[in-house]
Amino acid sequence: MIDDFAPTSSTGDAALYRLLSWLSPAYPVGAYTYSHGLETAVEDGLVHHRQSLADYVATVLHDGAAAIDGPLLAASWRAAQAEDHARLDELAVLGAAWRSSAETALETSAQGRAFCDVTQAAWPDSRFAAFCARHDESIVHPVAFGVASCWQGIPLRAALFGYLSAFAANLVSAGVRLIPLGQTDGQRAQAALLDDLQRATDHGLNTALEDAGSAVPMLDLFSIRHETQYTRLFRS
């Protein structure tokens, strides 16, 4: 089992390079087009400054989608490590069904499909290609990311912490544009989330899927209401 990066190892460097590439805003999965209901929260005045933005993202990490996607990513990584393809297929179906609104389903499935396409093109792996082909449009981002991370030699904790950090950073970026905030305040909000990200990572690593779930109906309602919001910059 791969536990950590070896800083002096070329293998560790290669895995880190892949992870950083996949988490970059330049990786073409379209993350920047989604606000995860934040646009409606800003419209309602619930999120209106740096602290309320950080609080919103922390809530998503602990009780929202990340509380599901963390355990889902970890389970996918472990199933890929075991080469348990039947379990991977189950997780792909579960991940697609485990969404609270049409827009959150679109958000994760569109990014999952885009991640499959670009990762197969740039970092080809026959097992990953076959897995993505079996699920076509239904594969969600955390499942695809967990599977690819395992088969490309990226340690589980690094993959999960990185995935959640990129998810949080994308929401902060959306908040900077929507509220609006200055870039420095955006970075302060991001810095304030470190403890939340570490706790969310621990939750993802240590929570069985049967014990995972979200518990923030207000966030779900923001996402549902966003579907008919009059003026929108984001797809969710």
From Swiss-Prot:
Main location: cytoplasm
Key words of the record: Chaperone, Cytoplasm, Nickel insertion
Classification via Gene3D superfamilies: Urease accessory protein UreF (1.10.4190.10)
Membrane-crossing residue ranges in chain numbering: none
Localisation: Cytoplasm
Any GO MF annotation of the entry: nickel cation binding
Family: Belongs to the UreF family.
Role, per record: Required for maturation of urease via the functional incorporation of the urease nickel metallocenter.
Protein name, entry field: Urease accessory protein UreF
Organism: Granulibacter bethesdensis (strain ATCC BAA-1260 / CGDNIH1)
Organism lineage: Bacteria, Pseudomonadati, Pseudomonadota, Alphaproteobacteria, Acetobacterales
